Amino acid sequence: MKETILSIPSPLGPPTDLLKFSWEGTPVKETVSIVGGIQGNHLNGIYLCSRLIRFLDAVEAEIEPDYILKGRIQVIPAVNLPAFQEGNRLWSFDDLDMDLAFPGNDQGEVAEQIAAAVYQHTKDSQFGIILNNADNHYEDAPHLVCMNPDSLTKDFARSLGPPNAREPENSPALRLCLYNQWTENRLPSVILSAGKPNHLDRALCETLFAGLVNSLLWTGVLVNKRKKAKKYPVRFNNRNNEKFVFAGAGGFFLLLVQPGSEIKKGQKIGEIVDMYSGTVIDSPLAQSDGYLVTLRDYPVVYQKEVLAVLLKKQKFSFWPF
């Protein structure tokens, strides 16, 4: 079912409609909420939602063989629709960060009204997934973000597929994001981050789509007559396990590695060349073995900027339960 959960009049054109798509089987025991497009440049997440909407419509119409709806699934594909339509991270009308507006205010500014609608429609779910990508100028290998997960959240994370989970930075900004509002409401939830902003990677989305469907099977809101949900190994990394590679000079950063690769201590991440002469002026090296989870994508860098984030290997890092 397609539903407009908020419509905001615009003086310059048609109203801004916040859409929610939902499917319901019987009996309804669990609800899973999936949210994408909190920023306008989260193209992978918005496309992934559209892929999921098409699939679930086919399941509901009994076109997709072997799948049966047994619970409630709701998808909000484009939270920051005005920014998405402009091709920007933030909407130029107010230039407010949507993910710093939660839990929102239904009588507040436009961003606060949107945040309030999203939160009210998802807060009573049993499971939640937020689709995200790397910050501007960076690219993320697929990974999960979760804070102090209990055993149920850990099992939920294992159903999604990415091999690594990270701990979010505990900052004032975290308290204002949708994910933190969910966790404070004791809603088992994760952030799934992959790819880079303003870029659509369809092959990556297909891989992530398979994991999303598997997670729906694990929660029980979706059933397949021929197969059960898979359980993937997940390596949990706290903040102390993250190792950064910094630029030793400013210039053009020419990368030599790709996100998602295993890096050896002393391995060259790339080269920084002088923007005028092309002379190599720095060769950043990894300071430890690790999984390359985030890599600088924009080539112009300044001295001491972060070029890469590695997740250092640990002896006991897989969740034991």
Regions from the language model: what does each represent?
Residues 1-321:
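Structured catalytic-domain cores with a bias toward divalent-metal coordination
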